[in-house]
Amino acid sequence: SLFIPMEWNMEGFIDRYGFPVFRTPTKEVLGVDDEMIDFGAIDYWENEVQSLKSDADALNEFYRQFPRTESHAFRDESKASLFNLTKIYQQIDYNDALITDHHLTRGSFRWLNGEKDTKVVFSPDTRGRFLVSWTPEKNLQNRIIVKNGKKYPGNEHLGAFGCDSYDISGVVGGGGSNGALHGVTKFNMDNAPSNEFFLQYVARPQTAEIFFEEVLMACVFYGMPILAENNKPRLLYHFKNRGYRGFSMNRPDKVYNKLSKTERELGGIPNSSEDVKQSHASAVESYIEKHVGLDMESTYRDKDEMGSMLFTRTLEDWAKFDINNRTKYDATISSGLAVMAIQKHLYQPQKIESKISVNFARYRNKGIYSELIK
């Protein structure tokens, strides 16, 4: 990398031998400009960051001017983002300080002994396209419920997946957007994290079929359903043709008898309508407010408890997301669909109960003839 952190060349913190003074020295050090240095560059930087925590734009400007990581150098103004950049960058900074290998595992899924539609196993692999923070215990892996000969996910109570798929294996020039898959857990009482993203996949394998199979294996291994875009239906046909239609969630904003013929056949949600776009963005926004960065008002958790979103690539995608030009934000699309999948009850149409009015004709019986009461 050509990036050099600011502390290696910050004016006023270079000693007379040309070496940077990172931390506050026990004794004053003579600087290259013949001035005494009594404070470290990193200590100065950390104090400035602490003093600017309440002003998101000023903090991002300071990060851009004095970057310690590559992500600092490309910070955006919070006004330009749809989501809460302060929380997103708090989480990114926290993640940067972690030893990633202790929290995330890169790997691949494969069918046991190469036999499809049996059991799926996860294997750590430095070349794998999956990044996971949690795998279920043995008794929760590969849980499938069979109803009337159809396969359904056995861990729907634990979480769900969201997917931004593609239909064409390759395009001229080798471009094209990535396929993306995210897994997130619900609040649960099992031995699993709650409201936490546990899987990230953002890649474009050599063929679309490889992508479809990898998505299918992830769903089978975790035993969780998937909410995918049905604008690009090949992934959903792959699930249906292999007997996993029960894993593909129907769009949560419509009752079953209001679904189109294709939606009943394949499931999925059209991610092109304005209502769905707004619901999708609101789902991501709500998740960020509740589970990313610090909760300074202690509304959802303790003030000093950091959020649990460990996938920095997705965080960076959220920071740049443009709702009017969504094509290149694969990670945001799939992660938003995953959040919608675990809170589908929020999008279900309300049943309008109408009172049945039964008007019986009533008569007043006085005299020889009865009289209709109006």
Predicted features and spans:
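Short alpha-helix plus adjacent loop in nuclease-associated cores
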Residues: 248-296
